[in-house]
Amino acid sequence: IQTLIRQAARWSAASLQDKTPLIAVLHSVYGAGYLWALKDIATDDQIAQFVDPKKFETEITKAMDIATKRAVAACPGYAGDVNSFLSQLAGEI
């Protein structure tokens, strides 16, 4: 559990420091992947022994949102055909 928490945090933090938007997306997806793996193998109660699970998920998701918005701003074609319903909910349009 601690290893997955550390890796999720490490990759997500890296994404916030990346200068290249698409590399930031890559690193944020790595971070989210570790979070999802963590959630697959551990309950919130188990995760809570090390970190607040809701806050942790919020921060990992926030890093991914920031990276994605940076990538779309730098490369508008990156967004492709967007689902306007989901984009509105995400605050992107």
Specify the residue positions occupied by each region the protein language model found.
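Long, charged/polar, soluble alpha-helical segments
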Residues: 1-93
